[in-house]
Regions:
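Compact, charge-rich alpha-helical regulatory domains located at protein termini
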Residues: 7-37, 45-53, 57-95
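A glycine-rich phosphate-binding loop feature that marks nucleotide/adenosyl-phosphate handling sites
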Residues: 33-36, 204-208, 242-250, 317-329, ...
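N-terminal basic/disordered segments at the start of proteins
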Residues: 112-144
Length: 409
């Protein structure tokens, strides 16, 4: 199919999508389809480039370098100095991600808000019916009884569907856009922060109970998981990042299937990187052994910022690693042995991200001009009447089309 389409001049992902419908539903096959398309183009002797879109004759890595070295703080400045045209729905979110990775400014401030995709624009994951999910951060999967009660009370008050996520936290579904600030105000008052479930950023640090409770535990995996999550929360990257910390080799936190995995040993911590448990599972690889906590944090700082600096748009660490020239040995040299002399620079860049962290939802609900954008209609305060729920297994779910028709009659 791709050969026929390329023969018929389909030389961009948008054209291939229109021709074959590849990537037109969930988008999961887009990276593979892009790879096939470029391989076929190269086989036919056609010019192949890694430009992000028609507005920037640069790869993501080159754009990151231009932003970082040039001290560029806005999309308009980036476009004026290094691009052309007005931008599009590919380069705008990409630029927003790079700007956030470099400078970590509030994503909904005026010059950045218009660049965000629909999830980042409303600081929530939009669902199939137009409602949003709410995911408060629970570092290391740890939550107090009072915290659980507060989440339950908020869910009950606003009639939300509750489910435990794979990342060991509570997901609340069914919030209308105008309810989001009210819900988050109550969660923040109860001590919660944004879980960044909507962002291409650090998601969760999964952990077992470790040596604190488990008779097999070798070290305090929960304590380390909480420390890691609080250090890297808010970091924007080319794609989402997941961690796991296990207190012994029984590996209950599945750290070897995560972007960053840490396993306790009797001499310290083993660090694994570039694992993935998604559509194409990949076993994480051991990059360093028996590390002290300080050395572990140093290597994770370097690894994450090197990934942020060099990966392609929407590329997970596993795919990035597969495409990295020199493979694991090269990655070890750069991160562990500091072969490029970038260590101190990468660590300083990460420290800036850590030092400038803010809970995006706390800033949003306390900034009137940001808060007022959370409504269904620009010229009305009325809620969206097309968001309809029905009861199932004691909770709400989105109404199907025939059920919605009956409810709206």
């Amino acid at each position: 199919g791709s050969e026929m389409c390329i023969r018929d001049s389909a030389c961009t992902m948008a054209e291939l999508k229109a021709c074959t419908q590849a990537g037109a539903t969930c988008g999961g096959c887009v990276p593979l389809a892009t790879q096939v398309m470029k391989a076929e183009m190269a086989r036919r002797g056609m010019a192949v480039n890694n430009h992000v879109c028609e507005h920037f004759p640069h790869s993501r890595q080159e754009l990151y370098h231009l932003v970082r070295v040039g001290g560029i703080k806005t999309f308009d400045e980036l476009l004026h100095r290094h691009g052309k045209g007005l931008g599009c729905d590919v380069c705008k979110p990409l630029a927003a991600s790079i700007l956030a990775s470099c400078w970590n400014e509030f994503v909904l401030q005026p010059q950045l808000a218009s660049l965000q995709d629909s999830n980042d624009y409303y600081l929530g994951n939009i669902q199939k019916d137009g409602s949003y999910s709410v995911v408060p951060r629970m570092p290391g999967g740890e939550v107090t009884p009072d915290g659980l009660i507060a989440v339950g009370q908020v869910a009950k008050k606003y009639g939300l569907y509750t489910k435990l996520t794979g990342g060991a936290r509570v997901d609340l579904f069914g919030a209308r856009v105008e309810q989001l600030p009210l819900i988050w105000e109550e969660l923040i008052a109860a001590g919660f922060e944004s879980g960044h479930a909507y962002g291409k950023s650090l998601r969760t640090v999964k952990s077992c109970v470790g040596s604190t409770w488990c008779r097999y535990g070798v070290d305090d995996s929960v304590g380390l998981a909480v420390q890691l999550e609080n250090r890297y929360k808010g970091l924007r990257a080319p794609h989402k990042i997941k961690f796991g910390v296990s207190g012994c080799t029984r590996e209950c936190a599945e750290a070897q299937g995560k972007d960053v995995g840490v396993i306790a040993t009797d001499k310290g911590w083993n660090l694994y990187v570039c694992g993935n448990g998604g559509m194409k599972p990949r076993h994480a690889e051991l990059i360093a052994s028996d590390l002290s906590k300080d050395r572990l944090l140093q290597l994770i700082d370097r690894f994450l910022m090197f990934y942020v600096r060099t990966a392609d748009r929407l590329q997970r660490t596993s795919t990035w690693r597969e495409n990295l020239e020199g493979g694991l040995d090269y990655l070890k040299d750069v991160v562990v042995n500091d072969s490029l002399g970038l260590g101190a620079e990468l660590e300083a860049q990460m420290q800036h991200v850590v030092d400038t962290y803010q809970c995006e939802w706390k800033t949003a609900v306390t900034t009137p001009e940001v808060r007022q954008r959370f409504r269904s209609f620009i010229n009305s305060d009325q809620p969206d009447e097309h968001i309809v729920f029905v009861q199932e297994r004691g909770q709400i779910r989105p109404a199907r089309s025939e059920e919605r028709s009956e409810a709206l009659v």
